[in-house]
Curated annotation (Swiss-Prot):
GO terms for cellular component: cytoplasm. InterPro entries: PRibTrfase_dom, PRTase-like, Pur/Pyrimidine_PRTase, Xanthine_PRibTrfase. This is Xanthine phosphoribosyltransferase. The gene is xpt. Homodimer. GO terms for molecular function: xanthine phosphoribosyltransferase activity. Its EC number is 2.4.2.22. Pathway: Purine metabolism; XMP biosynthesis via salvage pathway; XMP from xanthine: step 1/1.
Length: 195
């Protein structure tokens, strides 16, 4: 998605440890027009998947997930990372390691909002090692729902997440594919049909 790549080039910052900081438009300050376009793009890519719910993990996945749900006309569920006083029983849970924060969080989704007939699209802001998506897959397995794929805003192609998900049969659609962050520069992988 060229618009997203341009935002990354303009506002993204490469930090030590192969971290790409995009807090100017995605995970602190949010560009709602870009998020709307991201949601429309995911909806177009998965238009024939008969999706009934969109899932993500709080908090950076919420904006693109909500816009995807809006474009598809389906509800959005975000897995919580922290216990809530209002959501304290009847939960599906999984442990997820955060690459950027170097911590493990227990994510949870209420059984109340999950139906065994659901066809779920997973949305995440980044795909590096695939831990957040893997956690959502574990919850989907516990719930007995079908995952139709994973929509990723920014994929780090030089890390194993996408290949590991593909090996499990998960369809991955990434809007920006970063091939390298070497020397503080963001390089993108060319996709089929691009010059």
């Amino acid at each position: 998605m060229k618009e997203l790549e341009e935002k990354i080039r303009q506002f993204g910052t490469v930090l030590p440890g192969n971290v790409l900081k995009v807090d100017a438009f995605l995970n602190h300050q949010v560009d709602p027009v870009l998020m709307q376009h991201i949601g429309q793009e995911f909806a177009a890519r998965f238009k024939d998947a008969k999706i009934t719910k969109v899932w993500t993990v709080e908090s950076s996945g919420i904006a693109p997930a909500v816009m995807t749900g809006l474009a598809l006309g389906v509800p959005v569920i975000f897995a919580r990372k922290h216990k809530s006083l209002t959501l304290n029983s009847g939960m599906y849970t999984a442990d997820v390691y955060s690459y950027t924060k170097k911590t493990t969080n227990r994510i949870s989704i209420s059984k109340r909002y999950v139906d065994k007939t659901d066809r779920v699209l997973l949305i995440d802001d980044f795909l590096a090692n695939g831990q957040a998506v893997e956690g959502m897959l574990q919850i989907a397995d516990q719930a007995g729902v079908e995952v139709v794929g994973a929509g990723i805003v920014i994929e780090k192609c030089f890390q194993p997440g996408s290949a590991e998900l593909a090996a499990k049969g998960v369809r991955v659609e990434s809007l920006a594919k970063v091939s390298s962050l070497a020397d503080g520069q963001v390089s993108f992988k060319q996709t089929e049909g691009e010059d």
